[in-house]
């Protein structure tokens, strides 16, 4: 006998990227982590917090982070809400806006967690297909019964493509509901949508420190929205959702913009090399604005290639999409990791 709600029993749940065993020598190029260590300032900040002690609750509003992030992003601190990773932010937004029976809209293919969040609420989800240029048409903004929230990952995963901010603003202004622009990968891109929050109160931008700041193991994210949105989200936020270590570390991370610029520049160079080399092997590679590349092949099935890489110690993400096709999403690693990955791709194609 199950005691869960029927929608929980019926759902599959979100399945994260495969994780190697602790101590394994497998190279992870499947979950879009940063291949380099975080800023040394982060390590010093964590040491300071530990020396101060962990016996007291943290600041429930992560004020130090919000103040510094506001300066970096050019928004007031009270336009920022922090969470235990941006996934918690996405969860809070879904809880706040979407009730049982409501409709949540998302692009396809994109981040599969969005659909899971709708299922948890007992809500419906509607997937709107990207066109061949990874753009969204009028059907994404069309009114629909019960439509309460829409997600737009920008840059998108798995494609790494980005819709320009001017087009995003047009989408938001036509939307009959709030539009969450998920900017998990935006620091690797040429532009961002933060300024749209000031122009349209339906725009909510979510960010994470997992990718560009190399803090995936820490769990810290935030969103930027107009104050009335932030005030509503505070009502449902867990009281102490961000711990003292993550607040201290994330504040130090966002303060070190010189480290961020250097790290992002290095990854962008490696991204270009990975994409060019994959194309030379015969893959079709979408121009990426993220820290990964999306590879398809005109004639070769990709699952055997994925399995060949896995057998030889390289994990990439094999992602088949119904009605769309299959692809390999390959995270940008170090130059040495990329060299091994490319050699294995070439080897697999010869089989």
Regions found by a protein language model. Name each.
Residues 1-56, 146:
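N-terminal "arm"/small-domain region of PLP-dependent enzymes with the aminotransferase-like
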Residues 8, 29, 69, 80, ...:
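Generic structural signal for small/hydrophobic residues in well-ordered secondary structure
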Residues 61, 202-286:
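PLP-dependent aminotransferase class I/II
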Residues 63-103, 121, 299:
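Phosphate-binding glycine-rich loop
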Residues 78, 205, 281-284, 314-319:
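A short linear hydrophobic-aromatic micro-motif
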Residues 126, 130-187:
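Active-site phosphate-binding strand-loop segment of PLP-dependent enzymes
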Residues 268, 280-312, 328:
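Conserved PLP-binding catalytic core of the aspartate aminotransferase-like
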Residues 308-312, 317, 321-351:
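PLP-dependent enzyme catalytic core of the Aspartate aminotransferase-like
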């Amino acid at each position: 006998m199950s005691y869960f709600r029927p929608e929980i029993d019926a759902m599959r749940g979100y399945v994260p990227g495969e994780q190697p065993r602790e101590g394994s020598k497998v190279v992870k190029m499947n979950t879009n982590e940063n291949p380099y260590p975080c800023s040394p300032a982060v390590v010093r900040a964590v040491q300071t917090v530990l020396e101060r002690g962990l016996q007291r609750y943290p600041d429930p509003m992560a004020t130090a982070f919000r103040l510094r992030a506001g300066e970096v992003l050019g928004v007031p601190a009270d336009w920022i809400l922090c969470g235990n990773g941006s996934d918690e932010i996405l969860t809070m937004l879904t809880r706040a806006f979407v009730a049982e029976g409501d409709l949540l809209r998302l692009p396809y293919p994109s981040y599969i967690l969005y659909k899971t969040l709708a299922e948890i609420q007992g809500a419906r989800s509607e997937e709107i297909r990207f066109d061949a240029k990874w753009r969204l048409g009028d059907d994404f903004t069309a009114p629909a019964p019960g439509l309460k929230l829409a997600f737009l990952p920008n840059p998108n995963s798995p494609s790494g493509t980005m819709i320009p901010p001017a087009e995003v603003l047009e989408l938001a202004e036509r939307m009959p509901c709030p539009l969450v622009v998920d900017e998990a990968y935006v620091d690797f891109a040429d532009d961002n949508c933060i300024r749209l929050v000031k122009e349209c109160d339906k725009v909510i931008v979510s960010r994470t420190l997992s990718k560009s700041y190399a803090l995936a193991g820490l769990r810290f994210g935030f969103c930027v929205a107009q104050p009335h949105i932030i005030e509503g989200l505070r009502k449902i936020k867990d009281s102490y959702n961000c711990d003292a270590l993550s607040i201290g570390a994330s504040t130090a991370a966002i303060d070190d913009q010189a480290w961020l610029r250097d790290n992002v520049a290095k990854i962008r160079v490696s991204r270009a090399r990975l994409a060019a080399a994959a194309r030379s092997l015969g893959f079709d590679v979408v121009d990426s604005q993220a820290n990964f590349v999306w590879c398809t092949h005109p004639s070769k099935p990709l699952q055997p290639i994925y399995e060949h890489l896995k057998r030889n110690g390289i994990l990439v993400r094999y992602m088949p999409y119904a009605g769309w096709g299959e692809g390999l999403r390959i995270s940008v690693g170090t130059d040495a990791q990329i060299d091994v990955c490319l050699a294995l791709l070439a080897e697999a194609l010869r089989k």
